[in-house]
Amino acid sequence: MKPITREWVKKAEGDFATAQREIRARKNPNYDASCFHSQQCVEKYLKARLQEANITFGKTHDLSTLLDLALEIEPTWDALREDLRALTVFAVGYRYPGDAADKELAREAVTRCRKVRRIIRHSLSL
């Protein structure tokens, strides 16, 4: 695995740990953060897979855009499109006043993240 891919994976795992920690917190859980870091984990794993395959990607938080690039090398991942659409909303939307995630929404985000993470890690032989 390329060193830059390893860096993406390390950062993705940091986001995954934060997403899980926030949803499990008994005192002052930050469900918005859990949703955000679930999205960030998946974004970084997608970028890791693209990086490993030498596929250029721009600066985007849109998981569907990254998926479209990845389909060239991972065509079965199209089945993840709905999960990615659902997670993309958390890149920005819940970080500002107006929307707030509850525990149920955070659980859904972490569940989707865990599913996509498992598939991409398998693809990266992790």
Identify the meaning behind each predicted range.
Residues 1-126:
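Terminal alpha-helical segments
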